[in-house]
Amino acid sequence: MIARVCRLTKHSKPPHLPITLTTPTLFLVVLVLLQLHPICVLVNVDDGGGVTVKAISLLYSRKWNVKVINAVNAGLNASLAARNWTVAPGVNVEVVRPPSYDIDPAQFLDVYLKVLNDDKSLLVVLGPMGNDDAEKLYDTLEENRLVGFGPMTVSTRHEGYMPHLYFLRPEATGESYCPSTLCGESLRVLRQGFMYLDGLLGGSEAYDHAVDFISRMGYSFCCVFTVEDKAGGQGGSSEEFDAVWDEFAGGNPQAVIMFATMKPDAKKFLVRLVSDPRTEDTFVLTPIFLQKSIVSIWKETLEEANVPLHPHRVIQTGSNPLAKEDYIDAIKRFQTEMRNYLTEYKEWSGFNDADHFLKNDADGELMVNGWIAGEVLRRALRSHGWMNTATAFLESLYEQRRYVIDDIVVGDFGGECDSFTSANGATCRCNRGGKNVYMREIAEDYRLQPLVGGHIMTTPLQCHIDPSILRPPLTGLTVDMEDHEELLRGSTQFETGVSTTTSSGKAGEMNSFFLQKVVTDTQKVSNELNTLRQERIVTAVFGIVTKAVLGLPGLTFIDPITPTPHLNSFSRNVIHLSPTLEQQLYVLVNYLSSIRADFPNCVIRGGEAPAIIDALRKTLVTFGLNLSSTVVLTPGDTVGEHLPKSGITFIIGLAVDDIVVIEEHLRIHTKARVLVQFSDIALLYNEFVQAFNNSDGAKHLLFATSLPHWADVDTTSETVRRFHEAVREVEKWTPLSLLGFTTGRLIQENLQNMERVTSDLLVDLFFNQTVITIDDMHYGPYKHYDCIINGVVTADDCMANFGATDISVWSMARALRSDEPLLQNPMSPSLVYTVPNGNALTPAQLAGVVGGSLFVVALAICLSVLACFTLRGTRDNDSAPKEPTGPVTLIFTDIESSTALWAAHPDLMPDAVATHHRLIRSLITRYECYEVKTVGDSFMIASKSPFAAVQLAQELQLRFLRLDWETNALDESYREFEEQRAEGECEYTPPTAHMDPEVYSRLWNGLRVRVGIHTGLCDIRYDEVTKGYDYYGRTSNMAARTESVANGGQVLMTHAAYMSLSGEDRNQLDVTTLGATVLRGVPEPVRMYQLNAVPGRNFAALRLDRELFNDGEDETTTSCSDHSSLRAELSIAAQTIAASLQSLLGTFTPAQRQKALTPFCERCGVTLPRKMGHVWDNDSCQEVIRRIAAKVGHVVDRHAAETRERSVCTLSSGSVIIISNDLSDMIRV
C-alpha cells in the first residue's frame, strides 16, 4: 500500500488543521480507513526536488487536554514553517499527523509502518506524549530503529539510558530536586512536606530520591501525603484520605512538593490544602503537570474552595523559558516566528490571536517547548551523511551531539563508550539533553512569571542531575533599615560587595551561598528577625544590625556592624572578622606610644561609655600613658566645644553633624589629632569624603583597619584585585563594599568543605579551623575552650570570637588617596594588658615586703650563679616569633658544595665551618633573630622583622667576603668545580672560574653560602625536649625551596618576603626582579627577587632541577649538600667507624637501628638518602651508617694526623661525638 502525499504550496492551508477528539465509534472507523486508504501527508515541497524526510507526529495523547496538544504542535510548526519546511538545502520535512487525537498513537504508528512496508530509511518520530504511550511505543521504536524526538513524559521509569527516546527536557527526578533546593535557598522554610500518589509516575521512587537529597542538605520532610492511585482513575475512600490528610496537616508544612498529575485524589488534596487553616498559607511546588495547565488547575481549585488568589504561593518547574522572557535571544526569535505563524494561519483553532503566546502564559510555555523540538529536529537533519539507513541516523544522534539554539543549549547526547573515554570528557549513555530547570510562580491575575533565582543549570557534560553535586545552601540575611538613611546606604554598599560572591544557582557549583534582604526599620528589626528565625531557615545574619539584635537567641551573626560603639563580649554565635573596638584601641594606643604622644582626651557617645572609657584607660596604662580628660555626650550635644586646639582626642560614637565640625577644627588647628573607630568611617564614608576631600585636616584624622585599600588600582593585594574584578564601577569601591566582598569570599571558600550547613556547623567552622586565610586576608585564632566553671572563666585567653589580624593605622588622607603611606605598619594586637594595683600597702606591709624582697634577691643571686653553671645550654627564646597569627620571616642558609669541600679539604673544613657557624650566630644575635636549628652546615633562622632578616642575609655575604680565611684553597676548589661542570654541561658558563684574580678578590672569598628568605604564617610549636621553638607548614617549605634553587653567594627573596618590607625598607636595598620561578611542590610559579648583597656578582641560572630530600608539606625542610656521602670513598678511619656501628647495631631490628642512628644524623649533620620513607629497611640503615662514617671519618683523619691524644667532634649545633683512638684496636680484638 503506497501513501498519497498532499502537497502544500505557500498559499495553501496550514500544515495541520485543528484536530478535536472523536467519538469511540468514529475512532474505529478511522482505524479501518487507515488500513484501507492512503494517508494524507501535508507537506511543503521544494519544487527543485531533493530529499524528503517524513516526520510522524505522535505529539498527542488521548489522556491530555487538547489545548496542551495544540499549543505544543503550534510551536513545532512555527519553527519548521519559518524556514518553509526546509531544514537544509535539498532536505525537506513532511509532517504526518493522525486524522484525530482519539487514535491510539501506538496503533497509528504500527499502521503507518505497515503502509510504508520496508521503506523506513527517511523516517523520524515526533513525541510521544505521555508516560503510558511512551512505554507502549518503545518496543516498536526499537524494533524499527526509530527515535522519538522530544518525548514529553514525567515518569521516573524513563530515566535510564533509552536511546530510542530523544529527551529534550531534564528527568522528572531532577525536576523534583529543584523545588527541594528552592525550599532551602529562597523560601528558607523550616517544615517541608511531600505529596505523591503511589503507583503514579513513579511517585514512590521520586519520594525516595527526594528524601535522600534533602538529607544531604541536612533537612528532612516534616510530613508526607500519599494514597494509592486507584485503577480507572477513581479516587480512594474518603476515610483513608481524611486519615492521611489529618496526619499530613498536623505537621504544619510551610511548603509541599507535589509530584502527581491531576487525578481525583490530587485535585482533592489541593482543595484541602487551600481550605484547611493549618495549610492555607503553604507554598505548593510541583514539576510541570503537562496534562493540564497549572494556572487552570489552581484557578479551578480556588474557585471550588471559594478561596481568593494569593499570589506567589504556587511554584512550578519547567524545561524551557516562558514565551515572554524576551531577554533571552532564543525567545526573541521564537516570538517573531510564532507571531508570523499565527498571523498567516489565523484559522488555527484557539489561537486566532497572533499574540496569544504573550497573553496566555501556560500556552506560550508549551509553544516554546514545541518550537525548541522543531529547532533540534532541524539541526539533527542538516547533515546528509546519515540518510542511507535508519541505524546510521540513530548512531549520528549520539555522536557527542550538542544543539545551540541562540543562547539555549540542548545536550550533550552520547552513546555507548567505555569508562576511559568517559573519564576523558565524553558523554556516555545519555539520551537526555535538558540541562536547565526554569521555575516560575503564579502571580497576580493568574499570570506566570519567572521566579527570581529560580533557574538551575547543570553542565552539558553531566547527563542527569546528580543530587550529590547540589551543595547544601547557606541562607544568609542582610538587613535594610529604611528609616535610617546612613544605615540603609551602608547596607546597600555591603550588599554590593557580598552579592558578587553569592551563588548563581547553577547545579554542581561549589558555591552555595545565598543571601536575601530583610526590609524593616530600626524599631521593628529585632521583632521581625526573631519572628523570621522561627518560621524560616536563617543560617546567619551579615552586615549592619543594631546592638539589640545581637542579643537575639538562635541567630548567628558574621561580622556584625552596629551604629553605636560597644565592647566585645564573648558570644559563640557572634563572629567578628573586622577589628573589635578593643583591638582598634590597642593598635591606636600602640601608635601613640611609638610617637611619644601626650596623654590623650576622650569624647564618647553611647550607653557603654563608662565601660569603653575603662577599656581605653586600661590600654593607655599598658603603654605607659593615661587619659587626660573624658567627656560623655548626651543626645543633642556636639563635639566642637570639647575639641582641644592641640594634642590627641579619641572620639568614639560619631554623629553625622560631627564630621564637618571635626574637619574644620583639624584644618584650623594643625597640632590637633582626632582618632575615631573604623565602623564610623565605614558607615559615614560618603560624609567623610565630602568633608575631608582636598582638606589639610585629612592627615590629622586617624583610624585603624585590617582592610587593604579598597580603591588602590595599583594594588598588590589579591583581595583587592578580585574585588575590582567583581565590582567594576569605581564609584562603588567603598570600605563597606570591600568588607562585604571579603566576608563573602570567606563564606564562599569555606562552604566547599562543608557537607552540611547549619548555624552551629558554620560557627564550628571558625573554632575548629582556628586560623582562616582567604586570599591575603588572615583571621584568627578563634578559640572556645572549656574554661568556664559555674559561670566563671577559670583560664586566660581561652575564648576569642574575634580574628582580625594585620591591623594598621591610617589617616583619612590615605583613605582618600591610596598612595599616602601607612602611619603604622600592620600588627596583630595581643590584647595583653598591664593591670595596676590600686590597693596601697600599709607601712607594716611595706616593711615586710621590703625585708622579704631583700631575702629573695639574695637567694636569687645564689640561684642565678648556680644556674649559670648548670643551665648554660638552655636556649634563649626571647627573640623567637611566638605569635601564631603574626607572619614569620624564615631564612635558610647552606654552604655550596659542602660535601665536595669536605672530601677535598678535610683539614680545612672543620675550622672553616666553625667560623661559618660563629659568624652567622653573631649576626643572629645582632639582628635579634632566632636560631631554629642547624642541620650539618645549614641554618634555619626565624625573625619577627622581615627587614632584619634581609639585613642579616646581606651582612652575612659581606662578612664572608671580608673575612681572612688564611687560604685560597676553598676559592680554587670552587673554580675547579665550575670547570668540571662546564665540561659536562655544554650550555653552562662558569661565572667565576675564568675571572680576573683582582676582580675575583673584590667579589668572592672563602665559603659560598646561599640564602633563601620567605615570609608567611607558620604552625609554631614549642619543643619540650629542645626547649625551643620550631616552625612548620608551607612557609618553612617555601623558604627551604627558595634557598635550594639559589647559587652559592646568592640571596633570594620570595614575593611575599619582599612585599612584607615597607616602602622605606625597600628603598634601602639593591634588588633585582627574577620573575616567576617554578618551585618543586608549589602549584603556581613564585615571583623571586635577588638581593644584590655584593654588587657585581654574577650567578649561574637558578638550580630549578634541585630536589629536596624532604618533600612533605607539613614538615620543615632544609637543603642538603650537593652530593651524597654515598659517593665519597670511605677512608680507613671511616671504614673502621662503619664496621663498629654495624657490629654494634647488627643484632637490632631496622626500627631499633633507625631509632639509634637518627640522633647521630642530627648531631653530625648527616643528610638522609633521597626518597627515604618514614620506616627504614636494612638497606636504608646500611646507607645511613655509611654516611655517618664518611662524615666523621674526615674529622678523625685530620686530627689523627696532628696528634694521637686528641679526640674529635663534629661541627653540628652544639653536639659532640667522642671517638677513642683505641677504637680500631678494640674492634680487632
From Swiss-Prot:
GO terms for cellular component: membrane. Its cofactor is Mg(2+). Its EC number is 4.6.1.1. The keyword Transmembrane helix applies. Gene3D superfamilies: Nucleotide cyclase. It catalyses: ATP = 3',5'-cyclic AMP + diphosphate. The keyword Transmembrane helix applies. Residues 1-24, 867-1229 are cytoplasmic. Keywords: ATP-binding, cAMP biosynthesis, Glycoprotein, Lyase, Magnesium, Membrane, Metal-binding, Nucleotide-binding, Receptor, Transmembrane, Transmembrane helix. One of its GO terms (molecular function) is ATP binding. It comes from the Eukaryota. Disulfide bonds: none annotated. Binds 1 Mg(2+) ion per subunit. It is a multi-pass membrane protein. GO terms for biological process: cAMP biosynthetic process; intracellular signal transduction. Residues 46-845 are extracellular. Residues 889-1043 form the Guanylate cyclase domain. SUPFAM superfamilies: Nucleotide cyclase (SSF55073). It is found in: Membrane. CDD domains: Nucleotidyl_cyc_III. Could act as a receptor for an unknown ligand. This is Receptor-type adenylate cyclase GRESAG 4.3. It comes from Trypanosoma brucei brucei.
